[in-house]
């Protein structure tokens, strides 16, 4: 219960694929636009509403839309407006790519608490560990531009690896870390949408809006 109360002070603002699967060598960028505010990402990139890239996310993985455009997101300066990915009810999100991908992996992130990302050979975080990244807390460092949203610093990070990866484990404190422009096949994150051919009252990404939502249940 204590963890639940902590979570609602996070990334939500207090202040207010039927197409062929992606080849393992293709460079793909996931921006999460179109998933919808606080909706599960789930199979969106596996033919359920978005491009069919053969990419699935664990049930805890949610999309979050910037409060500037009517969502509950407590963030600013996101690399591709206006949606990011985060998790609220767990301390990790799992991404699976059944066909696998090679070369590298990269993304932008913003975090109030440290996190980790691990790349695995098998699905669901199984098999050999191919690469790992430690993510430092940096959510409000040297922010400029967009004045609304506590999570205003988005850092690009990536890693190259040998072999074929099929899953990624995004770890961190629930509601205190967000991700955007997740990129497969490159250790430099993309800053463009997915191609068709291929107020510090609350430090979390979601705040009072989510608290009210739970109270109604």
Residue ranges and their predicted role:
Residues 1-10, 217:
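Bacterial Sec-dependent N-terminal signal peptides
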Residues 2-5, 16, 22-23, 54, ...:
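Intrinsically disordered, low-complexity segments
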Residues 7-28, 175-205:
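Short, threonine-centered small-residue motifs that mark membrane-proximal processing/anchoring sites
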Residues 11-13, 19, 64, 97, ...:
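Generic detector of low-complexity/intrinsically disordered segments
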Residues 26-190:
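Surface-exposed, well-ordered secondary-structure segments
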Residues 111-112, 205, 215:
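Short, glycine/serine-rich, charged loops/turns that create anion-binding
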Residues 209-217:
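C-terminal membrane-anchoring or membrane-association module
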């Amino acid at each position: 219960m204590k963890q639940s109360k902590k979570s609602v002070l996070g990334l939500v603002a207090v202040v207010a694929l039927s197409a062929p699967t992606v080849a393992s060598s293709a460079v793909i960028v996931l921006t999460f636009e179109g998933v919808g505010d606080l909706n599960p990402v789930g199979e969106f990139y596996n033919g359920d509403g978005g491009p069919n890239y053969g990419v699935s996310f664990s049930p805890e993985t949610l999309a979050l839309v910037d409060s500037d455009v009517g969502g509950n997101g407590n963030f600013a300066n996101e690399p591709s407006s206006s949606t990011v990915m985060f998790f609220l009810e767990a301390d990790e999100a799992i991404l699976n790519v059944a066909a696998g991908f090679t070369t590298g992996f990269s993304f932008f992130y913003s975090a109030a608490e440290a996190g980790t990302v691990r790349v695995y050979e098998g699905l669901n975080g199984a098999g050999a560990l191919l690469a790992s990244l430690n993510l430092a807390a940096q959510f409000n460092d040297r922010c400029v531009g967009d004045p609304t949203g506590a999570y205003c610093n988005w850092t690009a990070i990536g890693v190259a690896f040998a072999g074929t990866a099929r899953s990624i484990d995004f770890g961190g404190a629930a509601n205190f870390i967000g991700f955007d422009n997740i990129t497969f096949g490159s250790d430099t994150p993309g800053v463009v949408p997915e191609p068709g051919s291929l107020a510090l009252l609350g430090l979390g990404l979601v705040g009072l809006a989510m608290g009210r939502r739970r109270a109604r249940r």
